[in-house]
Amino acid sequence: MNGDVIHVAAGSYVPSVPLTGMKTALDNTFEIHSNFSMIGGYPADAAEGAVADPVANETILDGDHAVCHVVAVTAAKMNGMKASLDGFTIKNGSSQFGSVGSTTIGGVKFYQSYGAGIFIGNATVDILNCKIVDNTDIRMGAIRVDAGAEALFDNCVVADNATKSTTTYNCGGLWADGAKLLRINNCTFSNNKASGVAPCIYVFGDTGGKTNVLISNTTISGNSVNPEHATLNGGGIYVRENGNLVIVNSTVYGNHSGKGGGIAVYGTAAKPSKAVIVSCTIAGNTTVTAGNGAGLQQAAVGGAIEVYNTLISGNTTDGAADDVAWFKDASYKVANSIIGGTVYNADGMAVAGAAFDPASMLSPLGDNGGATKTCVLLGDANPARQYGMSASELKILGETLDPAFGEAVSAIDQTGASRTGKTVIGAVVK
C-alpha cells in the first residue's frame, strides 16, 4: 500500500509472482506497484529496535538467471509520495534471447529484453545503498529508466553487468530513455560491458523524448566495449539524441571503447544533445581508433559540450595522447580547465607558461577518502591548483544549469572536502 514500510531480513529472495499483465515464470519480479518503502539489511533474527546494516546483513533480490527484471517499479506518481528501495543487492537478472513480450503500465512498455536488474517506469523512486551487479541483458541495460521517471540512485554500486551477445547490443549498465530527471550521486559504476555502444551509462531519448540526467560525486571506471570494436562509442558515458547531461564532481577513469573512451556526445539537428561537465577528472581512458577522443569525443554537430573546471588528461590511443576530439562546426566551450597539457583560462584561452603533465601531476585511481575512488593532484607547483573556478563561481554556475545543482554540491569536491578558498581544477582538491 502507499506509505507502507517493509523491513526485510538478511537472506536471498527469488521472485515468484509475474509482473502485472504478464503470465510466465520468466516475468516473475519484485514489483514495486505502490509508493511504499522496502528496507533491507536487518539481521535474520531481528528483534524490535534492530538497525539495518546491509553490509553486515546482505539482503539479496536474486533473479537466479531466470527472470527478465529482478525489480520492476510501476508505482503511479502521486503528489508528495515516492517509492524507495534501500539496502539491497539486486543480481542475476537475465533478459532472454527472443524475448519480445511486453506489458504497458502507466504508459510505459515493460519489454522483457530491457532492464534485467531494475526496470523503472513512469514512477518516482529512490534507490539507496544498493548494489546492482551480475545482471545480463540482451540490450538496454541492467537498469532501465524510462519515460517520465523521476529517480535517484544514491550511494549505489552498479558493477559487472553485461550484454549477452557478441552481436552489437548496447548498454550493459544503465540506460535512461525519456527520464524526467535521473539523479545519480555518490555512486560507483565499474566493470560493466556491452557488445555495442555505451557499456556503462547511456543517455538516449530514443523513444521517450528528452532525457535529463544529473550525475554528482560519482566514479565511472573500468567499463568497456567487449569484444573490442573500432567504431563503437562511449566507454564511460554516451549521450545521444535528446540526451541532456550535467556531470559534476565526478571521476571518469580507465574506460575503453572504439571512440570516446570516457565520454562521447552525439546529436542531430532534429534531436540535439548536450553535456555539461563541471569539476570532473577524466583520465586513463583509452580508445581503439586514434583521433576520436579517448577522454571526450564530440561525435556530431548536434552534440553540444561545455567544460568547466575540469581536468581531461592522460587519455590515450595505443599509448599516444588522445584526450579530446571536437567535431567541426559543433558547439563547445572550455573554461578554467585542462585538456592534455594545456591550461585554459575563463575565456577559453591557453595560459602562457602553464603546462600540465599527467604522468607526474595526477595519481592513478585510488582510495583518497569519500565514498568513491578518485585521482588526486601531485606536486605543489601543479597548475591545476591555481587556474580553476572559486566556490562562489561554481555556485553561480550550478544554479544556472538544467538540471541544476546547488551549493551542497558546488561547495565541496568528490571526497567531501571544501572548495572554499581554493581554485582547483578537477574532481578532488587535495
Predicted feature descriptions by range:
Residues G98-Q112, S165-T166, D206-G209, N226-A230, ...:
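Intrinsically disordered, low-complexity Ser/Thr- and acidic-rich flexible linkers and loops
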Residues G3-V5, A9-A10, S16-S37, A47-P54, ...:
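Predominantly extracellular beta-rich ligand-binding scaffolds that present long acidic/polar faces
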